[in-house]
Amino acid sequence: MAASLPLSAAIVGAEESVDKEVLEMEYLFEKFLMPSDLCSNTEWLGIPEEHVRKFGMMLEDRDGYSVIFFQDGVVPGKLWCFRYWKSNGVHGLTKGWRCFVREKGLKAGDTISFFRGSACGRLFICCRLGTHATFASSSTLHHGFSMPPPPARPLVGLQSGMLARDVPSLGQARLHDGNQDGGGAPSRHVPSSGRRVEAQLSRVSSRRQRRTMKHSIPEPTIETPPILESMFLIAAPPAVKCLRLFGVNIYVLPVSSSGQPKQESSP
């Protein structure tokens, strides 16, 4: 998979923090949770066989069972230990999975994803709640990692444990009432994310109202009839003169090629 470059805090709209470690992550796979994965009686998360080898080398607990350690993608420094079990060609995670489901509040329709640190080699697990919950593409976590589409490699910042979609941008974090330099009211910090979004939407709507829509009216065009090369112009014939002499109408025709005018008469 192609590696994604680390993004600065200014790009993702998060405030820069001191001593923040950014780790490049490699996407392994994700699983859409079914009701059978959340059954409290079995405590079993089925893993496709082609994805099991992506976990790498497993450890053994004191009872002799294979276990896999995952670092929580949201809570900094928290580790999850799942017992690996294989039976009749079916692979899955057993002991420890029920506790993870209960703490994260997972339900059928949620998605869990697995990642590996490109440099450290540690495994990470993260969950996505609901079918409509999406993670921002090319985003970062202050502690955990982002959830871009599968082909991308997310980033991990080991500090605060917030998703980039939950971190307000610098422009949304504070609202300024008046002008501080001009004697207005000082800026106040608004902790409510809903009020920040509402303020941002009001600014966008006010800018849209000031915009004037200009509709261009096409000017009428006069089409010129085409002139083909085979066409030639013919002069209009001169008008025929009519004279009445002694009760007889005399028509004077145009001059012929011989130079003599033709005359026709009618009673």
From Swiss-Prot:
Coiled-coil region list: none
GO molecular function: DNA binding; DNA-binding transcription factor activity
InterPro entries: B3_DNA-bd, DNA-bd_pseudobarrel_sf, LEC2-like
CDD domains (UniProt xref): B3_DNA (cd10017)
Transmembrane parts of this sequence: none
CC terms in the record's Gene Ontology section: nucleus
Keywords from the named record: DNA-binding, Nucleus, Transcription, Transcription regulation
Keyword Transmembrane found: no
Stretch list, region Disordered: 172-221
Keyword Nucleotide-binding: no
DNA-binding region range list: 30-131
Predominant localisation class: nucleus
Subcellular localization: Nucleus
Superkingdom of the source species: Eukaryota
Compositionally biased intervals (Basic residues): 205-214
Protein known as: B3 domain-containing protein Os02g0455800
UniProt organism field: Oryza sativa subsp. japonica (Rice)
